[in-house]
Amino acid sequence: MDIVFALGGSVLMPKDGASAENIKSYAQVFKKLKDMGHNVSIVVGGGNTAREYIKVSREFTNESVCDEIGIMATRMNAMLLISALSKYSVNFVPTNFKDAEMILNLGKILVMGGTHPAHTTDAVSATLAEFTNADLLVIATNVDGVYTKDPRTNNDAKKLEKMTTKELIEITGSNSISAGSSSVVDSLASKIIDRAKLKTIVVKGTPDEILKSVLGGHDGTIIIP
């Protein structure tokens, strides 16, 4: 199966900082899936690293430059994961899909970050899934699925176990597109998922849930075209 993972930067690089053991635990999951015969592509977010740099840079520059800074952070995070994957990947972070395709053609795990200003890594992962005709897109984030509202700030938020791409667009339509903004799935990604008719699963970004998103038994949200 061809699988694209959107790996949230905040789960790979949590607020308490970088941890070699944490990064290794994600690498082990992706290695296992590769050993099982799956083609694995990973788009890594910028997380707290990106947001801290963007917060500072916003004091003296515009959103487009902040976007570029955020993209650089995603690529640093991608390089960390590549290092942990060792021979399973290649020592290179592609910046476009043609280079990404070459890595997949080598039979390696593809790891990349952002590509264009104003595009989140969710949008990049959805576009990559469309480009590669992936069988599954997995969005691994800091909440355990899609909710009617942000569960971190709304006690009455209800989790959705299954939904359509059209329903996803309705929920995500008002999300911010400022540099460093974060939501479970952003509005552009939702539209690409709908356009490409991608089977998508949103899960809590733990190694165990990521594995279950492929093998079964996950506790996330299934999005169907």
Swiss-Prot record:
Inhibited by UTP. Homohexamer. Catalyzes the reversible phosphorylation of UMP to UDP. ATP binds at residues 9-10, 47, 51, 141-142, 147, 150. GO terms for molecular function: ATP binding; UMP kinase activity. It comes from Methanococcus vannielii (strain ATCC 35089 / DSM 1224 / JCM 13029 / OCM 148 / SB). This is Uridylate kinase. SUPFAM superfamilies: Carbamate kinase-like. The gene is pyrH. Keywords: ATP-binding, Cytoplasm, Kinase, Nucleotide-binding, Pyrimidine biosynthesis, Transferase. It comes from the Archaea. UMP binds at residues 46, 67, 115-121. Its EC number is 2.7.4.22. PANTHER family: URIDYLATE KINASE, URIDYLATE KINASE PUMPKIN, CHLOROPLASTIC. The keyword Nucleotide-binding applies. It is found in: Cytoplasm. It catalyses: UMP + ATP = UDP + ADP. InterPro entries: AceGlu_kinase-like_sf, Asp/Glu/Uridylate_kinase, Glu/AcGlu_kinase, Uridylate_kinase, Uridylate_kinase_arch/spir. GO terms for cellular component: cytoplasm. Pathway: Pyrimidine metabolism; CTP biosynthesis via de novo pathway; UDP from UMP (UMPK route): step 1/1.
